[in-house]
Amino acid sequence: MANGEIDEAEAERVFWDAIVVGTGMGGGTLGYSLARSGRRVLFIEQGRSTLPGVPGTIRAAMPELAEPLACRSVEGYQDALARAGRSTDEIEDISGRKPRLYQGLLGSGTGGSSSLYGMVCERFFAGDFTPRQYFHNPGDSTVPEAWPVTYDEMRPWYEAAEKLYGVRGQPDPLRPEAAEAPLPAAPPFSTANQVLVDYLRGRGLHPYHLPMACDYIDGCATCQSYLCAQQCKNDSARNCVLPAVAQHGAHLLTECRAVRLVADARNVKEVVCESRVGTLALKGKVVVLAAGALVTPALLLNSRSAEWPSGLANGSDWVGRNLMRHLIDLFEIWPERGERTLAPNKEIGLNDFYFWEGQKYGTIQSFGPMPPVELLTNGPGPLPKALHLVNPVVREVYQRFFNGGLVLAAMMEDLPYLDNRVLPSDGPSNHRRQRLRMQYRIHPGEIERRTVFTRQVKDLVKPFRKLNLRGAKDNRALAHVCGTCRFGEDPKSSVLDAQNRAHELANLYVVDTSYFPSSAGLNPSLTVAANALRVAAHIDATDFPS
């Protein structure tokens, strides 16, 4: 079939070398590496294929902007989301007094969330691999003294991932280890960003051009939150899944959701899926989960059996726990009075407050332009419908007060806690979509650090007209969700070993951000890709010895 897609019946007949659940930065990269080594790989993807040539795919704009009429009904909106590579899963947030239902802006389709990401791909600091020492008051956080791998062990995999994803940018002046990354240069700063860069340097700070997995073709809009139309976004769909199926014999099952793993005491025997034609039972030597830090733990917890009464690979009772998502506050500034910036501008990184006065906070970086007002007015439900009725007024207010500035994201590391978690849902939503249940609260240590961090940012941008858009308290901000199946040395306090294999199962691996034992304060994409290459090499050497 086109683009490597395989018939469901044929997929059931084959005994695969590796079944990879999810095609994002972790699954796509690992599957590509194994396929390139000659392994028979099957990708399972819950969402639609958005590979080139698939009809109906929405590119170059968010679906709320591209198909406004379709998005005003529930059915039309969900269909448009799926065709735009967006998740239709419902999230039930039980953190407050009353449960809240919403849909996160997460990827679903070939490439997963990498197809929507802002393309920032930079290495973690060496200190991120020994995190606990940088927090004065971790309280009851489970943040470890160290990851089970070191920066030095990750170094060659970082370099390989940077090459695979075509990363361009400048080294961070505050990070000696960044200077060793031989990255091609990114384009020069835009005029608006250069004004801010000059101001920051004048304050004695150290801005740099963010490393971006982008080819910067003429007309590049650095597509964030939607699919790229001109093939300059280097995501796992373009750089890994497509070559895996087109050149290296991998196969792809889309619109196919893994619902349960069947296992004995030591091995996963079947991956049970719901597909367009019904229930499938797929078999393989190795099973790799990369469905994201919400879906992966939910899948394990929903795989309870007599052999695994608490959920698969959950002897520690840590599956689903230690949920982290980064605490991100947005600040919009206007560096030049009377000037408006509407062009793509995701360029600046600043880490002067990453490690500051003996404490760890996070990064400040360009966020890109404000989302279109249609995100508010074009959707199902009473509020979008009401806003649509007064659309000219809403648009005027939005354009006047919320648009035209440079948006900076103050992204602070949050710590892992056992009570922040993903839980099994009681069942699907009313519309038969997958429902995920989560619980997350900001702990006192994070509240204290966030207060200090945001104070520094406000002081930094004091000379400019500014608008504090906040955001850190909003549990819908899940783009960097991680930590729910952490790796570590001790099976009592981790789910996976140092090679990302489940402590209790011989053939089960997890390579999405679930494995993070701490969230660091930077974008996770490059670390996920680098680690996936590392784990793929381990699987190839140990599970398929020559």
PLM region spans:
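Residue-level detector of alpha-helix initiation sites
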Residues: 20, 24-25, 29, 191, ...
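N-terminal glycine-rich phosphate/pyrophosphate-binding loop and immediately adjacent elements
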Residues: 2-138, 143, 148, 152, ...
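FAD cofactor-binding and catalytic pocket of flavoenzymes
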Residues: 88-113, 117, 121-123, 128-131, ...
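A glycine-rich dinucleotide-binding beta-alpha-beta segment and adjacent secondary-structure elements
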Residues: 209-229, 259-267, 403-414, 419, ...
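Alpha-helix N-cap/helix-initiation motif
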Residues: 23, 233, 269, 312, ...
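Conserved redox-cofactor binding core of oxidoreductases
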Residues: 69, 73-87, 93, 97-103, ...
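Glycine-rich loop(s) and the adjacent beta-strand/alpha-helix scaffold that form part
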Residues: 36, 40-64, 247, 256, ...
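Secondary-structure capping and boundary motifs in well-ordered enzyme cores
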Residues: 12, 26, 291-292, 315, ...
